[in-house]
């Protein structure tokens, strides 16, 4: 009996470590708060509210001049019963967040449109990246009338853009897990 208990202690310790690590990781998790699509002029457009959470290590790296990058990935998929869903459209919005110590400003650059916005606080900069409005995702004419379509969205932190010494820390440290999970919803294919 004692031998069984002794052998299970490492497993118990490992389970506790995994549990506490996952609780700790969720504190910094980026997420999709709200998302919707609507039909405007024969085109479906997306509106989304995102929520970025920063760890102390990410904030420190940013303040030391390390730019941080995110890709917001959006997919429109046609549901198929006996095969994988077919991706009809893909979109990406790429943001670069950087702190300029000389100006004491946070700079957000949309890498797709090259639009740059300056903010005096990190919170304001993150809010600037957190709102998507009227993003065209698919033409109504590309949709089959009786098919079911799904839209997926994910915020992907690009840890490969970090300097090499930080990239090794990212693998082992939950404070650098700044991506979201996929969020999926049904695209209402309006017939009128």
Labelled PLM ranges:
Residues 24-33:
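Cleaved targeting-peptide boundary
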Residues 36-46, 58-66, 82-86, 141-144:
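Short, solvent-exposed beta-strand/turn "edge" segments of beta-rich domains on protein surfaces
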Residues 137-192:
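Glycine-rich, aromatic-bearing surface loops/beta-hairpins
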């Amino acid at each position: 009996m004692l031998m069984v208990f002794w052998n299970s202690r490492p497993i118990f310790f490992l389970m506790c470590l995994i549990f506490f690590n996952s609780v700790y990781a969720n504190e910094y998790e980026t997420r999709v708060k709200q998302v919707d699509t609507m039909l405007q002029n024969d085109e479906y457009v997306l509106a989304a509210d995102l929520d970025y959470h920063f760890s102390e290590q990410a904030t420190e790296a940013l303040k030391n001049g390390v730019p941080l990058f995110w890709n917001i990935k959006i997919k429109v998929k046609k549901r198929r019963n006996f095969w994988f869903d077919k991706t009809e459209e893909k979109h990406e919005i790429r943001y670069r967040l950087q702190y300029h110590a000389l100006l004491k400003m946070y700079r957000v650059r949309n890498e797709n449109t090259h639009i740059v916005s300056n903010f005096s606080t990190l919170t304001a900069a993150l809010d600037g990246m957190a709102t998507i409005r009227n993003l065209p995702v698919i033409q109504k004419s590309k949709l089959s009338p009786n098919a079911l379509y799904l839209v997926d969205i994910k915020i992907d932190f690009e840890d490969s853009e970090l300097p090499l010494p930080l990239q090794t820390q990212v693998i082992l440290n939950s404070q650098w897990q700044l991506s979201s999970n996929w969020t999926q919803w049904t695209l209402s294919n309006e017939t009128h």
